[in-house]
Amino acid sequence: HVANADRRKMFGFDTGPVNIISNYMCKVLFGMEYDKDGAIAASGKVDKGLMDHFMNHPFWDRPVPRSGWSQDYSEEYIKATIQKFSALPKEDLLATACAFTGEAVARSMKENVPEDIIKSTDKLYASGGGVKNPQIMKEIQKRVPDNIKVTTSAEIGIPPEYKEAIKFATIAYS
């Protein structure tokens, strides 16, 4: 979401499912609600085939503003993905899910944010549950332009758990 006093320069959209995929994979593969501290994902390797699978999801065909959430990346979609890539180590599935989040943010910026705004931006404020996963934050930082530091919305006094309210207010206003 880009906030600006000039409403014509303000826009908002989802960059993808963020931690929906990794949390559900943790539940199915490891019997855990989420990957605490991103430790499991950090022990895996990113798989190109699985990454391509995620990046070819129909979500990417929709124009912004768009929202990507549990209807797009449903339990059925994630179960089918796990089955399709069952030959991969479980840790690699999770590592790729986290890397996909970083790739999704970078792709969304490149495709939808004017280049001059990207070049003049020095911080990306992340919010939501994904900010609690250091591996997701690392993957985002690795993929966004070097001039941008990825941090959480807490740095500017907005609790990360208020993501949904902020997201939909920005999308509605833009």
State the predicted function of each range.
Residues G12, D37, A126-S127, T152-S153:
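Thr-Gly-centered strand-to-loop micro-motif
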Residues H1-I40:
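Glycine-rich phosphate-binding loop of actin/hexokinase-like ATP-binding domains
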Residues M32-E33, G38-K123, P134-I148:
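A contiguous, well-structured pocket-lining segment that forms one wall/lid of small-molecule binding clefts
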Residues K9-G12, L88-D92, S153-P160:
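A short glycine/serine-rich beta->alpha loop
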Residues K123-N133, A165:
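Glycine-rich beta-strand-to-loop/alpha-helix junction loops that act as flexible
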Residues C26, A95, A99, T151-S174:
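Glycine-rich phosphate-binding/hydrolytic loop that grips phosphoryl groups
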Residues K132-Q135, I158-P159:
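Flexible loop/turn segments at secondary-structure boundaries
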Residues I21-M25, T81, V105, M109, ...:
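Buried hydrophobic packing segments
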